[in-house]
Amino acid sequence: MSPKESQQLVYTTQLISFLTSQYQDEIKITGANFSWKFDWNSPYLGAGATFLDNTYSIVLLGGTVRSTGSDFDVLSVTLCHEIGHILGGAPHQRFGDQLEEDWSSAEGQSDWFAASQCLPKVFQHFKEVGLINVSPSFAENSTCQKTARPLMCEWIRNASQKFSDSIYEIYIKSDGVTPRPMLSLDAPEVVQNTLVGTYPSHDNVDTVVQEY
């Protein structure tokens, strides 16, 4: 294992441990069990939330942690988003006219939970232990300067942009058509209906920006 991979494994286990301490009891209040399915040795890309046999599980494959563009910030957004599928509430995902995953929050709602509930907890804790290092100049020349918590706001915005960049590079860029989602750009369309089975073309960035 390379030094970089060792570092990735350490911060992944730290993040999983912290999120478990924050949300395990809240999930168990629903009457269900909770588990992590983290396979460091898997070369594949993948992360998700499942509900089977009265157990909520968050799946994380090692290839995701080690992928190009992934770091602690990107992993934080990824795992907070997956917890959002479990605890984010309505609206819930729907695939087709009949099949509704009434346990799983819609993609945008999961992003909202991540930005408003989970990522602030991650920022506060890991800033205190030194894994997140930000200086007062971090949020200069940013709209976050107008918020009550500019450093946290800017970290979450940057982490979310990096998350979107990684998704774009892996899954979307190859189509040669879809533009890269950017914090500095408005979505090209006005949303008329809540999307419960997918993202709009601008991905999750707009949702995160609106939280701050």
Model-derived segments and spans:
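Short coil-to-beta-strand
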Residues: 53-60, 73-86
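Extracytoplasmic/secreted proteins, especially bacterial periplasmic and envelope-associated proteins
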Residues: 14, 18, 74, 78, ...
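Short pre-active-site segment immediately N-terminal to the catalytic Zn-binding motif
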Residues: 62-77, 101-102
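C-terminal capping/extension segments of zinc metalloprotease domains
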Residues: 1-57, 62-67, 120-212
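Catalytic Zn2+-binding segment of zinc metalloproteases
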Residues: 83-103, 109, 115-126
